[in-house]
A protein has these predicted regions:
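Hydrophobic/aromatic residues located in beta-strands of well-ordered beta-sheets
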Residues: 4, 34, 112, 142-143
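Glycine-rich phosphate/pyrophosphate-binding loop and the adjoining helix
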Residues: 5, 141-185
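Short hydrophobic segments within beta-strands
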Residues: 7-9, 37, 115
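N-terminal beta-loop-helix "entrance" segment that forms/cooperates
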Residues: 37-55, 154-158
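Helix-loop-strand module that forms the ligand-binding subsite of alpha/beta enzymes
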Residues: 55-138
Length: 185
């Protein structure tokens, strides 16, 4: 069974994207193993502390390396991705040894699915920018560009803190789950 590492772009305890990930986890039951990446303790990228890498950075790099694939669930912040998610990707894109640009990074070639729950744009810009970032020549992740799922949250979600997916949204997620399982082989 394939191991998929879920990365939630929001660190909020009651994150809609964490709830979206839980929906996908249920759809993946008995088809893949799911683990959630805790990167809340990863420090801001700073070359002064890059070598040796902080323990939290070593841990997340190890988790990414162990996974067969990644699934990122992210909100959209100002037409892009959250800063702490970018910080994680910055750390994953850095060499493991000072001056060594030859050793592959844990994220190189990693198959990635993208989904998000948010406002009116349904995280379209966030997913576009993440695809652009993750496919840079030195990151070289293998992003599945179609299908992706963007959920436009209804007003009740924002006022009551509950995310209720429509049947159509659930079906879009199911299609993405099936496609991603095929994509990662």
């Amino acid at each position: 069974m394939k191991k998929i590492l879920f990365i939630i772009g929001s660190l909020r305890k009651e994150s809609f994207n964490k709830k979206l990930a839980k929906e996908v986890e249920e759809m993946l039951a008995r088809r893949a193993t799911v683990e959630y990446l805790d990167y809340s303790d990863v420090p801001l990228m700073n070359q002064d502390i890059e070598f040796p890498a902080p323990e939290a950075v070593k841990r997340v790099r190890g988790k990414v390396a162990e996974a067969d694939a990644l699934w990122i669930f992210s909100p959209e912040y100002n037409y892009s991705y959250p800063g702490h998610l970018k910080n994680l990707i910055d750390w994953l894109s850095r060499p493991l040894v000072a001056g060594d640009r030859q050793t592959p990074l844990s994220i190189n070639g990693k198959k990635v699915a993208l989904s998000g729950a948010g406002g009116a744009s349904a995280t379209t810009k966030c997913r576009e920018k993440l695809t652009e970032l993750l496919t840079l020549p030195f990151i070289k992740a293998d992003v599945m560009t179609e299908p992706q799922t963007g959920i436009q949250l209804n007003m009740e979600a924002w006022t009551e803190g509950r995310m209720m997916l429509t049947d159509a949204q659930k079906e879009n997620l199911r299609l993405q789950v099936d496609a991603f399982l095929e994509y990662i082989g």
